[in-house]
């Protein structure tokens, strides 16, 4: 048969299939902009900032609407009420993990982030319980974070107040906390293997937020047959995965079943307990995928929040001064901050919350999946439908947070200056897919920020009026623009008295 004829017939079949699927699905799903055959609404979406496109569509179609990314329909939830109703009130039905093809090429549906069904339920439950176990041990997670915070301070002191880009140093600290939990050891900040891992984490988070990766996730065939930055993402993933596998093998050789040292040992013990269960979710492949998930998620999100937060503190010097005054009054300079201090530091607590709200790190979160046919607000959403959750619409809700585009710790303070909780604070998402490391991340952010500001004054290289805090990249994540800063050491009280 003529190759040209084959091509024409193939394209025609795809076109007809696309038209049939779209017309069949649109009668049942929530309304939305009219999709084009094959490419769907892709041309109507600003890939450099999907969140802005979602906000625009919500003004036309309301809090629940449908977008076609390629030939797949995605139901979009916009606003607190719609998101809460779906993720919390109907948590089980919306608990699936949606399509994310680039990551699926690596994890194969295993691990704790991109898995579904029993794999996800059992691995997530085990991971949370194991993290809690370490939190109740002799050397708690808070101890590990405090220790790492002091290592971070010593590394920052080496700059001697000279300007530098803090990206890698701020990435090393949360990564080392995760390493101490998973591998039982931390890295020196100059370790070449560590720096290589940090570079790959940082590069992947940046590339994940690029328009090209959004296109790859929309049209998965690109991943296997076309060149592009997605290949570097996969290369980085496989490097990290192989590194984790080597660490697992080392643990297998030195395992003491009665004295588990870290997360890997606990998982290996679980594998041994279930070795006669052919349906067990606890396999070597699952262990590697889970540790890789924890390694990546526990590093880049926290480090980016730290980096973005310090940029905001550089710009808002009045806010920084108030935090440092509170640190001086409650903690002083001669002991390390601890989580017990937080209840006495409402302003600092509000600042940490406002940083997370303002930067809106992952504006549309990872996609969810409907686990069974469901009627939602008079719409029929069939099992297997992908769901996009707009966290931006909640974190920047102008009714809950007046002037949401303004950085203002007052969003989390009452009229008496006490810390004020908000149900709209959802940087970690909500429901059954809420970030498993939320407690760890909250502890890290409070202790790292307070320890840095206890020991250093921040100085910008440019006038504070010229500091730009708008994201440099707005895709999967909001990444801060490049900046350099000076960390000027604050003299401790004991060093001051020695000079008197």
UniProtKB/Swiss-Prot annotation:
Keyword Metal-binding: yes
This protein's name: Cytochrome P450 2C11
Gene coding for it: Cyp2c11
EC number per UniProt: 1.14.14.1
Binding residues annotated for heme, in chain numbering: 435
GO biological process: epoxygenase P450 pathway; icosanoid biosynthetic process; organic acid metabolic process; retinoic acid metabolic process; steroid metabolic process; xenobiotic metabolic process
Effect of residue 116 to S: In strain: Wistar Gunn
Entry similarity comment: Belongs to the cytochrome P450 family.
Localization: Endoplasmic reticulum membrane; Microsome membrane
A Pfam family hit: p450
PANTHER family for this protein: CYTOCHROME P450 2C9, CYTOCHROME P450 508A4-RELATED
Pathway: Lipid metabolism; arachidonate metabolism; Steroid metabolism
UniProt-listed InterPro entries: Cyt_P450, Cyt_P450_CS, Cyt_P450_E_grp-I, Cyt_P450_E_grp-I_CYP2B-like, Cyt_P450_sf, Cytochrome_P450_fam2
Principal location listed in the UniProt entry: endoplasmic reticulum
Reactions that this protein is recorded to catalyse: an organic molecule + reduced [NADPH--hemoprotein reductase] + O2 = an alcohol + oxidized [NADPH--hemoprotein reductase] + H2O + H(+); testosterone + reduced [NADPH--hemoprotein reductase] + O2 = 2alpha,17beta-dihydroxyandrost-4-en-3-one + oxidized [NADPH--hemoprotein reductase] + H2O + H(+); testosterone + reduced [NADPH--hemoprotein reductase] + O2 = 16alpha,17beta-dihydroxyandrost-4-en-3-one + oxidized [NADPH--hemoprotein reductase] + H2O + H(+); (5Z,8Z,11Z,14Z)-eicosatetraenoate + reduced [NADPH--hemoprotein reductase] + O2 = (8R,9S)-epoxy-(5Z,11Z,14Z)-eicosatrienoate + oxidized [NADPH--hemoprotein reductase] + H2O + H(+)
Tissue spec: Liver and kidney; male-specific.
Top-level taxonomy: Eukaryota, Metazoa, Chordata, Craniata, Vertebrata
């Amino acid at each position: 048969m003529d190759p040209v004829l084959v091509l024409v017939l193939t394209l025609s079949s795809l076109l007809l299939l696309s038209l049939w699927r779209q017309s069949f699905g649109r009668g049942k799903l929530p309304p939305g902009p009219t999709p084009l055959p094959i490419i769907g609404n892709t041309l109507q979406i600003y890939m450099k900032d999907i969140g802005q496109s979602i906000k625009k569509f919500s003004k036309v179609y309301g809090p629940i609407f449908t977008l076609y990314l390629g030939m797949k329909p995605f139901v979009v939830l916009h606003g607190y009420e719609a998101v809460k109703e779906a993720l919390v009130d109907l948590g089980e039905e919306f608990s699936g993990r949606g399509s994310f093809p680039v990551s699926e090429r690596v994890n194969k549906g295993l691990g704790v982030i991109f898995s579904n069904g029993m794999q996800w339920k059992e691995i997530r439950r085990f991971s949370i319980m194991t993290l809690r176990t370490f939190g109740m041990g002799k050397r708690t997670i808070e101890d590990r974070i405090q220790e790492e915070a002091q290592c971070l301070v010593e590394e920052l002191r080496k700059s001697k107040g000279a300007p530098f880009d803090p990206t890698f140093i701020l990435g090393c600290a949360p990564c080392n906390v995760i390493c101490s939990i998973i591998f039982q050891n931390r890295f020196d900040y100059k370790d070449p293997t560590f720096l290589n891992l940090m570079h790959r984490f940082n590069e992947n988070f940046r590339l994940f937020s690029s328009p090209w990766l959004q296109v790859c996730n929309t049209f998965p065939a690109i991943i296997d047959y076309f060149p592009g930055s997605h290949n570097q993402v996969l290369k980085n993933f496989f490097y990290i995965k192989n590194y984790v596998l080597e660490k697992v093998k080392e643990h297998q050789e030195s395992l003491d079943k009665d004295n588990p040292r870290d997360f890997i040992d606990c998982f290996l013990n679980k594998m041994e307990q279930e070795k006669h269960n052919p349906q067990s979710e606890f396999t070597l492949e699952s262990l590697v995928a889970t540790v890789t998930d924890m390694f990546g998620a526990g590093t880049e999100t926290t480090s980016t929040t730290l980096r973005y937060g310090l940029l905001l503190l550089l710009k808002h010097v009045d806010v920084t001064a108030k935090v440092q005054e509170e640190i001086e009054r409650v903690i002083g300079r001669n002991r390390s901050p601890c989580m017990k201090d937080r209840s006495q530091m409402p302003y600092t607590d509000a600042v940490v919350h406002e940083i997370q709200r303002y930067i809106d790190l992952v504006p549309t979160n990872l996609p969810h999946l409907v686990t069974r046919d469901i009627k939602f607000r008079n719409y029929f959403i069939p099992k297997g439908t992908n769901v996009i959750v707009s966290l931006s619409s909640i974190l920047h809700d102008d009714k809950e947070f007046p002037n949401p585009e303004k950085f203002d710790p007052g969003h989390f303070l009452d009229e008496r200056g006490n810390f004020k909780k908000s149900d709209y604070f959802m940087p970690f998402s909500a429901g059954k897919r809420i970030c498993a490391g939320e407690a760890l991340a909250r502890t890290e952010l409070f202790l790292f920020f307070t320890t840095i500001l206890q020991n250093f004054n921040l100085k910008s290289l440019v006038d504070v009026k010229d500091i730009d805090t708008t994201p440099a990249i707005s895709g999967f994540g909001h990444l801060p623009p490049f900046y350099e800063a000076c960390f000027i050491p604050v003299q401790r009280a004991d060093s001051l008295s020695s000079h008197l």
